[in-house]
Amino acid sequence: MSAAGRRGLIVAIDGPSGAGKSTITKLLADRLGYIHIDTGAMFRTVALAASRAGIAPDNDASLAGLCADLEIAFVRNNGCCRVTANGEDVTDAIRTPAISALTSAISARKVVRDVLLRLQRHMAREGGVILEGRDIGTVVFPDADVKFFLSASVEERGRRRYLELKAKGQEVSLDETIAAVARRDEQDSGREHAPLRRADDAVDIDSTGLSIEEVLDRMESIVRERERATPGA
């Protein structure tokens, strides 16, 4: 689609697990008036559906059939973005430690990635969107208008995840949560298909020790500058 026919830019935010991508992307989308497409939530939704159906993460034939029958959508409810699977709100169900662990294995399967890749590109075709994940700027939208690589130290990311899980009433330890984040990094960086990798033209944002507002201010400034330089955006 030409720039003149678009509603805005395509913004890609990549980074490791626990870097705060979902929180930052949602808030940045609100500031910009863009749509937030949470690609990580899409993989988590497939993982949840596979878990419920008893499908092993290496059973490509069954995963293909599962994806074909799975309708994933993002809807706004009272100002909050919710994830649905075939009409069921699964926003909270996809955020458990068990589903988090399964998601890394599921997201490594090419059959799953291919289906979700087509869906993500379809959702973002008219621009005015922010997508976050681990390979948005390298695989899904290598020509995205703005690319960010959002990161933080393993300890910082583990601490954030620990506090998030505790707030939900889950019994976890800080050391175990940090170790789980480190394992996820290793899995995501070493997988065969679309491993976690920083795009060469991405802007690095290290959020260690920074407030959410500080991170948002910097990222919004970069996007606004690109908007002014892009006709039709």
From Swiss-Prot:
<keyword id="KW-0547">Nucleotide-binding</keyword>
<comment type="similarity">
    <text>Belongs to the cytidylate kinase family. Type 1 subfamily.</text>
</comment>
<dbReference type="GO" id="GO:0015949">
    <property type="term" value="P:nucleobase-containing small molecule interconversion"/>
</dbReference>
<keyword id="KW-0808">Transferase</keyword>
<feature type="binding site">
    <location>
        <begin position="15"/>
        <end position="23"/>
    </location>
    <ligand>
        <name>ATP</name>
    </ligand>
</feature>
<dbReference type="GO" id="GO:0006220">
    <property type="term" value="P:pyrimidine nucleotide metabolic process"/>
</dbReference>
<feature type="compositionally biased region" description="Basic and acidic residues">
    <location>
        <begin position="183"/>
        <end position="201"/>
    </location>
</feature>
<feature type="region of interest" description="Disordered">
    <location>
        <begin position="183"/>
        <end position="202"/>
    </location>
</feature>
<dbReference type="InterPro" id="IPR027417">
    <property type="entry name" value="P-loop_NTPase"/>
</dbReference>
<dbReference type="GO" id="GO:0005524">
    <property type="term" value="F:ATP binding"/>
</dbReference>
<keyword id="KW-0418">Kinase</keyword>
<keyword id="KW-0067">ATP-binding</keyword>
<dbReference type="GO" id="GO:0036430">
    <property type="term" value="F:CMP kinase activity"/>
</dbReference>
<protein>
    <recommendedName>
        <fullName>Cytidylate kinase</fullName>
        <ecNumber>2.7.4.25</ecNumber>
    </recommendedName>
</protein>
<dbReference type="GO" id="GO:0005829">
    <property type="term" value="C:cytosol"/>
</dbReference>
<dbReference type="InterPro" id="IPR003136">
    <property type="entry name" value="Cytidylate_kin"/>
</dbReference>
<dbReference type="InterPro" id="IPR011994">
    <property type="entry name" value="Cytidylate_kinase_dom"/>
</dbReference>
<keyword id="KW-0963">Cytoplasm</keyword>
<dbReference type="Pfam" id="PF02224">
    <property type="entry name" value="Cytidylate_kin"/>
</dbReference>
<dbReference type="GO" id="GO:0036431">
    <property type="term" value="F:dCMP kinase activity"/>
</dbReference>
<dbReference type="GO" id="GO:0004127">
    <property type="term" value="F:(d)CMP kinase activity"/>
</dbReference>
